[in-house]
Amino acid sequence: MSLRKPLEATPGAFGGLDTDSPSCRPLDTVTVHVQGRARGDERCTVRVCDPDQQPYFEQELELRDNQGSLQFLAAGPLGNHYIYVTFPGESYHSRYLNFHLDCETAVESGDSDFDPLYPFTRDRMLLGRREYETPRGRFVGYISADTLHLDGIWLRDWIYGLPAYKYWELDMQCGLDRFIEAQHENGMIPDGIERNGGTWRAWVESDVEYIMTLGVWQTWKVTGDDAWMAGALPALERALAYVQRDERVWDPGHQLVKRQHSCDTWDFDIDSAGDLGGGRHVIANCDQSGYYVAFRAMGEMYAHLGRTDEAEAWTRKAEAYRQRAVELLWDGTKFLHHVHLDEIDHDGFDETGQLTMGNTWAMTRGLASPEQARSIIDEYRRRHAETGDAYPWWSLQPGYPDELGYWSAPFLKQGAYANGGLMPWVGGELCRAALLNGREDYGVELLRQWAEHLRRTGGAHVWYWPDGEPGFRTTNEVPYAGWGMGEWTAALVEGLAGITDSGGQMRTVQVNPRWAAAGVAEVRTTVRYAANRAYFAYRLRTDRRAATLRLDFTGSGEQARFAVLLPRGWQPTRVSLDERPVEFKAVSVDASVYVAFGSGIAGAQAVIIECETD
């Protein structure tokens, strides 16, 4: 016996709703198919809401033969989104359907130099990820690629890989907790922690406390864990106070950090002296850029917590520190390697001519002005052409001559390791600095060189000889140096793709796409923190015939500030956002022209930039 089914209780009474896929990425085109009700409908309204039920797309759809389709760009917060269909005469929707919005960090330009860089880096760096159960608790970190501490984590190598691992790592805080727990009573931070919980400190170094500060600051900006950050601030206060009172690392005359005589930021003295920081002091440019940005970071963290007095004090301290450092170390072309505080005779070798790795930090950390940065970049280009070395990634250029007899170890000869060897992290910082300071063409050239290096060699060692051959010093050398690959990731994501998280968790994003310098006409870029759902995504298309650019964007945040690099010879004449004109400025960075404007982030938005050409 067949049952009689009331039409009112069947799909036909409610209509049909479907999409082309149950999941998608931000700025994907979603196609919605609507089947009208059995009674027949001429139109309906389609509304799309994000996971918080906030609508970001709504359109009336005309139905023909009781069917219709439309498209929209998926946008807004990650998670399950809602599509609602409402037919005429209804006060409540007739049908609804979810689709899932998710994404990972990716660059999709169609250029074989750029697109593989991020996945290659992620896959190789994950080989150096370590997860320990120490006596104090769980520790997650990333190894040094050449250390004798095979089962330990150097703070510096780990944190200097953060510009890359912040996009995929889920557990970013526990390792920093272990370092805070191991802080000495006087405020000093250890250099590293072993699997068994033991610690070590290289006494030559004066940078560990600023690295710790940067680690907490950058991790907090990713995770958004205000309570954790506030809990770490007292430890950072003690660490930075220690630096400013210990006579081994503070020069009261110049009011700047000092260190025992070393090769820039590295952890050994000339002559392998072991006086535990008691003499042979210098003020090195590498330390000054680090403490300048660490003081700024303290100001930003206190400001976020509403502690205005502390924030302003640290901000004033940072700027005064920068001024003292620049006045002492800038030589008119570059920053000096260091200034001697104790008399050291280098037997006629002139250190003032050395171009040191710390100069790249001076540019990316803001110690150098834009004009000073361009001077340094041009000096790198000049020396690279002059030397013919494989890459301009020098630790020192030139290194200390072997005739001085400072080191007997083969890996410390001139042109090796930190005495003139080529270090990928230096190249990455130089590349990002070039992209940020009006030398975009050179930055693209460097990034393409790096891509070719990875294709040819399959990885990144800690250092190379000037001819490009990998340099070895321990049995623990592996070709996945996070302190190196991380800096090139920043050059790709923040430099070329131009996405920088200004406010933490991508609430406020600075978006400076520089694809015009690479000749890329169409690109899609997504940046996402795996530890949460913070992300930003854009599509950029350049129409050279019409002299226009179209920028579609979305994200999880609130505000975006744009400065889009224009092709050579273009000048902006009009900028519209969702077909409404917006205020803009043409900003010159040396010979480069950017068009700058701002916008809130709400759903999928489209910017059209119209230009005139020479």
What is the meaning of each model-derived region?
Residues 113-121, 168-181, 226-246, 290, ...:
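Extended, well-ordered alpha-helical scaffold segments
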Residues 1-26:
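Short, compositionally biased P/S/T/A/G/V-rich stretches that sit at domain boundaries
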Residues 34, 416, 429-614:
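Non-catalytic C-terminal accessory modules of carbohydrate-active enzymes
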